[in-house]
Each structure stands twice: as structure tokens, then as C-alpha cells.
């Protein structure tokens, strides 16, 4: 269900609809097409228990009141109940419609034509304060329709949060801003604590998995630039497994990430959000995820969060505090 002009309307996955702001978007990001593969039963270790706790309902109420989107909802994150029940959430800036169409992602796609909520930076900051967060992750849709890709909006939000309480740790999980250094500088020049950008998959699968405007080395060079300009800012990336990659390719991706100074890496199982998206090629066992973590730490990452249900921002506060990462 989508809420349009205050009315809940059923929009089928893959269908086109008109947003409240007057531009068109595609529900779940991928147009209707034949199923990619026969449905594969999920193993028992991927089953999630629902937890509608008081904290979960509190976070949901605050984000709705302040007209904020969360990647937890828009990307159908399997950890939404756990994270929200612990009073944490990942706020998605600049709306819920992305200008790109990655084949694994269920976020709606379209062209927002420059629309931005100018009140969002302060609304986000006030929400963080009301939730009582010590650590917040800010992420966003890609906004190629904006001159700076939305970097200035990100910076304004980080600054608003830090102005309310400079002790709140802020992680910015950003788009690539087309790899333009002047845009990246807008984020670096705030008091941000962690800058993350997801490489998503191994180099061989980048084109079939990600939007053509994204790039394997574009992501790595983005994070390399961040580390060179601001060595004290932690850098982070994330890989999904189960898209057809090999373990050897995963380890090579780890090597490439370490070669540009990335500090933290997360690995989790890809799960097909709708029948129109890429199918799951394999389910990786919890034991193999433990092996990924062991290898990653041996390669020099300060922290490796690896598990079937791990996502890039999963309990990011906890990951940040491990191994003396707290700033």
C-alpha cells in the first residue's frame, strides 16, 4: 500500500504511479516482467520473528510524524523489528524515490525533478533527539536530478544533528555523488564520524546487479578519497552474497577494499524482494559467514559484521563500538 494525498492506495509491484509531488515513479523499482526463477524456499536460519514492541511503535510514530522515510521500510529490511525494538533506525533522506534502478533493490524509482523537503534536516535532527539515539545512520536514495547529488542536503542534516547534540555519532551511508570530489567534500567537511558507501557485489557482477551509473571502482575510489582527505573518519562498505559470486571473488573484493583503506566491512545474504528482482543463486550458511569474518579480520579490517541477516546499517552502533572503534 502507498499513501498518496493521505489516502492508502494499492499499487502493484512494478507498476507506475504518480507521487504526491507530481512526478511518476515505479513501485519497488523494477517494472513487471516474468519471474526470474522458481521460488526457492528460505532455510530456517533466515526466518524472522515479529516484534511489535513499545520501542518499535515509538520509532514508527516519530518517523511518520516528522514525514521521514526509513530505509528499514522502503528496502524491506529483515531486521526492522529487531532494530526498531532497540530504538534505532536508519533515516532515508531526500524522499523515497530513487533516480537509479539497481536490480536487487525494492526502493521505488523515478525522477523527482529537483524536489526536496527543505525542512527535512531539522525534522531528522528532532526525530533523532526524540528517539534518544546515541548513534544514527543517515542514508538516501540516489538523486542524480540534483546538481550536487544531494550532498548539500546530507551535510545540512548532519550539521543539524550535531548542533542539537555533538555527542551523537553520525554515520552517512551515501550515494556516490557521481564521483565528483567537490560533492564528497561537503560530507567530509561536517563533523561526520563514519562515511559508508556500499560496493554491493563483486566486480564481475557489478553491471548485472547495480545501475549502470554505479561502478565498482567508483565506489572504492570514493572511499579512498574520503580516507585521504580525512584519515580520522572511519570508512565502511557492504557486500551482499548469494548473487552468483564465488568465495574467492568475495576475498578479492575484501583485498580491493583494504587497498583503499576501508576500515569496516559488512556481509549479508541477498534476499529477492519481489519476483521481478534478481533471483537468489545460493543461500550461504551461518558457518561460512563466520569464515568470512575470520578472513576479513585477518586481512586487516578493524571490524567485520558478517551473518545471514546482516545489512550495511544493521545495529551499526554496536559495530562501531567494537574493537575500540569509538571515537
Curated annotation (Swiss-Prot):
The keyword Metal-binding applies. Its cofactor is [4Fe-4S] cluster. It is an enzyme of class 2 (transferase). GO terms for cellular component: cytoplasm. It is found in: Cytoplasm. Binds 2 [4Fe-4S] clusters per subunit. One cluster is coordinated with 3 cysteines and an exchangeable S-adenosyl-L-methionine. InterPro entries: Aldolase_TIM, Elp3/MiaA/NifB-like_rSAM, LIAS_N, Lipoyl_synth, rSAM. The keyword Nucleus does not apply. It catalyses: [[Fe-S] cluster scaffold protein carrying a second [4Fe-4S](2+) cluster] + N(6)-octanoyl-L-lysyl-[protein] + 2 oxidized [2Fe-2S]-[ferredoxin] + 2 S-adenosyl-L-methionine + 4 H(+) = [[Fe-S] cluster scaffold protein] + N(6)-[(R)-dihydrolipoyl]-L-lysyl-[protein] + 4 Fe(3+) + 2 hydrogen sulfide + 2 5'-deoxyadenosine + 2 L-methionine + 2 reduced [2Fe-2S]-[ferredoxin]. Its main location: cytoplasm. This is Lipoyl synthase. It comes from Francisella tularensis subsp. mediasiatica (strain FSC147). The lineage of its organism: Bacteria, Pseudomonadati, Pseudomonadota, Gammaproteobacteria, Thiotrichales. The gene is lipA.
Amino acid at each position: 500500500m502507498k499513501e498518496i494525498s493521505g489516502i492508502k492506495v494499492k499499487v502493484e509491484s512494478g507498476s507506475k504511479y504518480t507521487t504526491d509531488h507530481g512526478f511518476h515513479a515505479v513501485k519497488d523499482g523494477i517494472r513487471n516482467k516474468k519471474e526470474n526463477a522458481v521460488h526457492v524456499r528460505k532455510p530456517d536460519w533466515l526466518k524472522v520473528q515479529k516484534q511489535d514492541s513499545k520501542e518499535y511503535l515509538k520509532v514508527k510514530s516519530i518517523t511518520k510524524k516528522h514525514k521521514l522515510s526509513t530505509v528499514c521500510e522502503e528496502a524491506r529490511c529483515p531486521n526492522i523489528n529487531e532494530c526498531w525494538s532497540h530504538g534505532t533506525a536508519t533515516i532515508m533522506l531526500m524522499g523515497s524515490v530513487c533516480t537509479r534502478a539497481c536490480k536487487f533493490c525494492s526502493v521505488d524509482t523515478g525522477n523527482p525533478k529537483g524536489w526536496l523537503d527543505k525542512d527535512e534536516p531539522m525534522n531528522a535532527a528532532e526525530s533523532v533527539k526524540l528517539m534518544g539515539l546515541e548513534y544514527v545512520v543517515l542514508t538516501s536514495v540516489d538523486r542524480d536530478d540534483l546538481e550536487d547529488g544531494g550532498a548539500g542536503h546530507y551535510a545540512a542534516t548532519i550539521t543539524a544533528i550535531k548542533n542539537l547534540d555533538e555527542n551523537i555519532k553520525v554515520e552517512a551511508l551515501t550515494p556516490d555523488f557521481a564521483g565528483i570530489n567537490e560533492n564528497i567534500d561537503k560530507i567530509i567537511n561536517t563533523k561526520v564520524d563514519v562515511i559508508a558507501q556500499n560496493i554491493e557485489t563483486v566486480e564481475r557482477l557489478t553491471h548485472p546487479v547495480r545501475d549502470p551509473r554505479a561502478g565498482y571502482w567508483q565506489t572504492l575510489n570514493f572511499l579512498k578519497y574520503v580516507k585521504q582527505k580525512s584519515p580520522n573518519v572511519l570508512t565502511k562498505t557492504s557486500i551482499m552474497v548469494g548473487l552468483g559470486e564465488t568465495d574467492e571473488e568475495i576475498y578479492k573484493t575484501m583485498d580491493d577494499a583494504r587497498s583503499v583503506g576501508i576500515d569496516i566491512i559488512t556481509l549479508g545474504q541477498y534476499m529477492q524482494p519481489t519476483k521481478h528482482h534478481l533471483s537468489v543463486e545460493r543461500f550461504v550458511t551461518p558457518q561460512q559467514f563466520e569464515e568470512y569474518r575470520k578472513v576479513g579480520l585477518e586481512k586487516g579490517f578493524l571490524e567485520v559484521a558478517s551473518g545471514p541477516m546482516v545489512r550495511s546499517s544493521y545495529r551499526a552502533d554496536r559495530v562501531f563500538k567494537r574493537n575500540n572503534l569509538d571515537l
